[in-house]
Amino acid sequence: MTLWINGDWITGQGERRRKTNPVSAEIIWQGNDANAAQVAEACQAARAAFPRWARQPFAARQAIVEKFAALLEAHKAELTEVIARETGKPRWEAATEVTAMINKIAISIKAYHARTGEQKSELVDGAATLRHRPHGVLAVFGPYNFPGHLPNGHIVPALLAGNTLIFKPSELTPWTGETVIKLWERAGLPAGVLNLVQGGRETGQALSSLDDLDGLLFTGSASTGYQLHRQLSGQPEKILALEMGGNNPLIIEDVANIDAAVHLTLQSAFITAGQRCTCARRLLVKQGAQGDAFLARLVDVAGRLQPGRWDDDPQPFIGGLISAQAAQHVMEAWRQREALGGRTLLAPRKVKEGTSLLTPGIIELTGVADVPDEEVFGPLLNVWRYAHFDEAIRLANNTRFGLSCGLVSTDRAQFEQLLLEARAGIVNWNKPLTGAASTAPFGGVGASGNHRPSAWYAADYCAWPMVSLESPELTLPATLSPGLDFSRREAV
């Protein structure tokens, strides 16, 4: 029973799917995809549940969401293990993901009141009231890198706003999706308010093509995001929130403390085995002896990183990638860049064939032509050297993406220049690119997406503003507009 539709657990009628741990190959989940008819059934259930859910007092919706938060806290260890075993990330990092899920709920509730909710302005002859209304039935597409935390950033604000949902987790993380939905069930969500459909491309296409959807909230790759954008083009009545990837630059301009700069770079490029959309993909290092020393130290320390199993003791900094195929894709990208003329500074290495354990790779591409402007979702860092800061900004902006950008420098003026000229939604100074706060907007421009799917700013796209001019009485104005004559004529 792997689908949850209209409050019932049912068996999918689509393709059989099996999920294994990406490092041990242990089978950890089995089930069937939802077919097109079941996807449509989930949408019908969400549509039927919408009027009653939307009319619930906000306090009632909030109470269920807060019960979910309490269940997350009570089952934190269990969910941590599920996420770690399914994604391959270390236990310590999976635990931080569950903590982020819990913390985001209180922020989402506060954001609803601050950014949406209801506001009234008194007028001479009545009032002007701003209210927010839910869109209706929304589809939520989840990614695999943070299979609990990132969908949660759509689901919680959308439910608080009064929407009903169909959630499709990544086909690479079905177990996490199912585990989280079971907690929502225990929290007391009414039937049909949140529905779970498992599956891959066919299930996703069936979901995104439903005429009765009022919108789609997506976190994932740029290629899939572009497909969804094309599919929903010409349908302005549907809200489409896209959070996609990045080909993110980190500029190393002025290094006062080389080890601190190396630590920041490791956190930016290789945490989560390079599987964060904000990870640094392009390292821009100033030419000269200081830059040379920084790169030598980076290669030295990065070369000591040994990925390990989720439950290793002591815990590793990074675990496996989401699949052995993902690790192979990173290896192929590295070889492609070598073939273009890149100079390998640190060769990535498969720790064990057939697993997703992969050591970091670093390759210099200064002066190399035709380097693909793509997001390689893994621990591969591309290096360019530059002569002056204006050139660094030009290199940083030489991408169709625009998610995150960072600067290591002691010069505040350079950061202020970067703030003005960088084409990115996140611009950091002496901070890792991969840090994020739920109280701040998260997202970018260009191929990185449109809206800002964090707990605070997600409220903006989960409801639409409605303005009302209101008066309890209807009276004739004392002063009429020119040309209007309401004088009463005497009867003949």
From Swiss-Prot:
Reaction(s) catalysed by this chain's protein: N-succinyl-L-glutamate 5-semialdehyde + NAD(+) + H2O = N-succinyl-L-glutamate + NADH + 2 H(+)
Positions bound to NAD(+): 220-225
Pfam families in alphabetical order: Aldedh (PF00171)
Known pathway: Amino-acid degradation; L-arginine degradation via AST pathway; L-glutamate and succinate from L-arginine: step 4/5
Keywords of this entry: Arginine metabolism, NAD, Oxidoreductase
Gene Ontology molecular function: succinylglutamate-semialdehyde dehydrogenase activity
Top-level taxon of origin: Bacteria
Residues of the active site: 243, 277
Biological processes per GO annotation: arginine catabolic process to glutamate; arginine catabolic process to succinate
Enzyme Commission number: 1.2.1.71
UniProt record similarity statement: Belongs to the aldehyde dehydrogenase family. AstD subfamily.
PANTHER family per the UniProt record, alphabetical: ALDEHYDE DEHYDROGENASE-RELATED
Function recorded in the entry: Catalyzes the NAD-dependent reduction of succinylglutamate semialdehyde into succinylglutamate.
Annotated protein name in UniProt: N-succinylglutamate 5-semialdehyde dehydrogenase
Record organism: Salmonella dublin (strain CT_02021853)
